Every structure is written in C-alpha cells, then in structure tokens.
C-alpha cells in the first residue's frame, strides 16, 4: 500500500502550517502541530501545551491514516508518488466525503488524469472567500502532474 512521501509531508506542513504551541483554530477548537485536534500522549490539546517537531510529525502521520485509507478505498487506478502526495494534501483539507463525491475522483477513476488534475482547482473556496485556496490547489495540481 502506498504512503505519503517525506516530500509530501513537507509540502503538507507548508500548506497547512505547523505550530508547536497549542492555539485555537478558526472554529475555536484547541489545535497543535499540523491541524491536530485529538489527544497528545493521552492528554487533550489545551492552551499552553507545547510539542516537539518530532511529535508533530508523529501526530501528522497518525492523522493521515484516514486520508491514506480514503485513497486506498476510493481510487481504483494506479498512481505515482507525486499524484498520491497531491491527493493526500487535497483530501486532508477537504475531507473524505467531499473527495468521495468529487470530480477529481470521478475523472481519476476514468483514467482521465489531466481532467482530475484540473478538477483540483474547483476546490478553491473556504468560508466567504471564493478563491482563498486557489494558490494551494494550483500547487497541488502541479505536483499531481509532475
């Protein structure tokens, strides 16, 4: 089974941001590392909590398990490592159910790799900003096509 590469992890950290000190996310949820909201060594994320970069990477690998499971269960065509890494970044951001109903997945499973790549650009809206994620999607699309 494929897994995200170290290059994919580095890119995902750059896209999502990594914070080694706990903070409240845009919805007020205590968060640490790369968007981690679960427990850290059995403790809930709380104000003042800090972690090492190594712990952040460990948490991210655990948090990516559902993403990798989504790819394994939904994608029915061969992928190269860059395509896999780009999909990990997209799915980590939009969620499994959104990906499951996406044009990206539909085109991919038809072996229309170019159309699948172009469909990344449809996932550009967040909150009230219709284009805020477009630069990220362009980078993911470029990785997918490389």
Swiss-Prot record:
The keyword Cell division does not apply. GO terms for cellular component: host cell cytoplasm. The lineage of its organism: Viruses, Duplodnaviria, Heunggongvirae, Uroviricota, Caudoviricetes. InterPro entries: Bacteriophage_GH24, Endolysin_autolysin, Endolysin_T4_type, Glyco_hydro_24, Lysozyme-like_dom_sf, Lysozyme_dom_sf. Keywords: Antimicrobial, Bacteriolytic enzyme, Cytolysis, Glycosidase, Host cell lysis by virus, Host cytoplasm, Hydrolase, Viral release from host cell. It is an enzyme of class 3 (hydrolase). The active site is at residues 16, 25. This is Endolysin. The keyword NAD does not apply.
């Amino acid at each position: 089974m494929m897994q995200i590469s170290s290059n994919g992890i580095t890119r995902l950290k750059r896209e999502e941001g990594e914070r080694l000190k706990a903070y409240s996310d845009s919805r007020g949820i205590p968060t640490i590392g790369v968007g981690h909201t679960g427990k850290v060594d059995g403790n809930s994320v709380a104000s003042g909590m800090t972690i090492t970069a190594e712990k952040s990477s460990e948490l991210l690998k655990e948090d990516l398990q559902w993403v990798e499971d989504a790819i394994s269960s939904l994608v029915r065509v061969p992928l190269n490592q860059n395509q896999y890494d780009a999909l990990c970044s997209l799915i980590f951001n939009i969620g499994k159910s959104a990906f499951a109903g996406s044009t990206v997945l539909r085109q991919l499973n038809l072996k229309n790799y170019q159309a699948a790549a172009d469909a990344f650009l449809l996932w550009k809206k967040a909150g009230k900003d219709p284009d805020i994620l477009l630069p990220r999607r362009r980078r993911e699309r470029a990785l997918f096509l490389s």
